[in-house]
């Protein structure tokens, strides 16, 4: 059995091509546990999680990456946010009924794939592409073609392992500033395309690579753990409250007695009473956390 929730990087010794392989189970489960989603939405979030992990691993700096789908369909928003430490969180917004067999275009409708890269140092970058492909992987390949101009292929699989949702994926990309032959890259992509969900989700990474590339020389590097981690906090909520007009905050306090701020990603609630608000306005730290 593979060690799920790990990202593996690998290189081909005889080709200027790099690869990544990731499988997720517990991370995906934690994202899904916070909400009740129809199965097609769960599948989209699983694919987005895999894609975000793979894309984050291509970054050469510390920072965040957000991959989101948005459109006018019943799935108005699906987003995964991750960072270079492979810490992930995600959420979806559903409006209207979703058939069990809904595909990506049925779910999102007329929409876009938006990728936002935010380095800890440097300028923020955002790329937007229309949903012209039939799958998320195809849309992401279109993004790379338009923005990175590096030949890139993604292979994403979803399923269940021991009754729990799981997902996996592989990425192939020509090394920057290298002259990989197109036929070599296409050959490796054809091999990778043959990976089955069961193989990717149940076999160790080295076994997967052997099945796909046993005639090639491949170097597999130490894995990086993938985990669910939400960045919400009481302090961030306090900062958000401070940006609201005083009269709006006071009106909520008068009606409700306290302000309940809810994190869509992890489900935490942060409660603020009148004393907390007074301390926020005085630039003091709010009273002891009230989280449930």
Swiss-Prot record:
* Keywords per UniProt: Chaperone, Cytoplasm, Disulfide bond, Redox-active center, Zinc
Is Cytoplasm included in the keywords of this UniProt record?
Answer: yes
A single BP term in Gene Ontology: protein refolding
- List where in the cell it is found: Cytoplasm
Which residues does UniProt call coiled coil? Answer: none
Q: Which GO terms describe its molecular function?
A: protein folding chaperone; unfolded protein binding
Disulfide partners: 230-232, 263-266
Keyword Oxidoreductase attached: no
In terms of InterPro entries, this protein maps to: Heat_shock_Hsp33 (IPR000397), Heat_shock_Hsp33_C (IPR016154), Heat_shock_Hsp33_N (IPR016153), Hsp33_helix_hairpin_bin_dom_sf (IPR023212)
Modifications the protein undergoes after translation, according to the UniProt entry: Under oxidizing conditions two disulfide bonds are formed involving the reactive cysteines. Under reducing conditions zinc is bound to the reactive cysteines and the protein is inactive.
Of the GO CC terms on this record, one is: cytoplasm
The cross-references to HAMAP family, in alphabetical order and at most eight, read: HslO (MF_00117)
NCBIfam families xrefs: PRK00114.1
Q: Family, per the entry?
A: Belongs to the HSP33 family.
Functional summary from the UniProt entry: Redox regulated molecular chaperone. Protects both thermally unfolding and oxidatively damaged proteins from irreversible aggregation. Plays an important role in the bacterial defense system toward oxidative stress.
Name the UniProt record assigns to this protein: 33 kDa chaperonin
User: Which species?
Assistant: Salmonella choleraesuis (strain SC-B67)
Q: What is the lineage of its organism?
A: Bacteria, Pseudomonadati, Pseudomonadota, Gammaproteobacteria, Enterobacterales
Q: Which gene holds the coding sequence for this protein?
A: hslO
């Amino acid at each position: 059995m593979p060690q799920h929730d790990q990202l593996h990087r690998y290189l081909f010794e005889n080709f200027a091509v790099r690869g990544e392989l990731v499988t997720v189970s517990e991370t995906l489960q934690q994202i899904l546990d916070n909400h009740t989603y129809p199965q097609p939405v769960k599948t989209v979030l699983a694919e987005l999680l895999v894609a975000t992990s793979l894309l984050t691993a291509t970054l050469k700096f510390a920072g965040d990456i957000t991959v989101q789908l948005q459109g006018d369909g019943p799935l108005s928003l699906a987003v995964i946010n991750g960072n270079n430490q492979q810490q992930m969180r995600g959420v979806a917004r559903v409006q209207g009924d979703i058939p069990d067999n809904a595909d990506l275009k049925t779910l999102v409708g007329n929409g876009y794939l938006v990728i936002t890269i935010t380095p800890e140092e440097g300028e923020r970058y955002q790329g937007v592409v229309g949903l012209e492909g039939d799958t998320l992987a195809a849309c992401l390949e279109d993004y790379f073609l338009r923005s990175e101009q590096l030949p890139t292929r993604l292979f994403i699989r979803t399923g269940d392992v021991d009754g729990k949702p799981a997902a996996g994926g592989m990425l192939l990309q020509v090394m920057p500033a290298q002259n990989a032959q197109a036929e070599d890259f296409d050959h490796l992509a054809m091999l990778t395309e043959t990976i089955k969900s069961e193989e990717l989700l149940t076999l160790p990474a080295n076994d997967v690579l052997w099945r796909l590339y046993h005639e090639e020389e491949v170097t597999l590097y130490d894995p990086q753990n993938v985990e669910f981690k939400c960045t919400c906090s009481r302090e961030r909520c306090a900062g958000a409250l401070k940006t609201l007009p005083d009269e709006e905050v006071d009106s909520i306090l008068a009606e409700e007695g306290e302000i309940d701020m809810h994190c869509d990603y992890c489900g935490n609630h942060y409660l603020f009473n009148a004393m907390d608000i007074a301390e926020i306005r005085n630039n003091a730290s709010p009273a002891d956390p009230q989280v449930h």
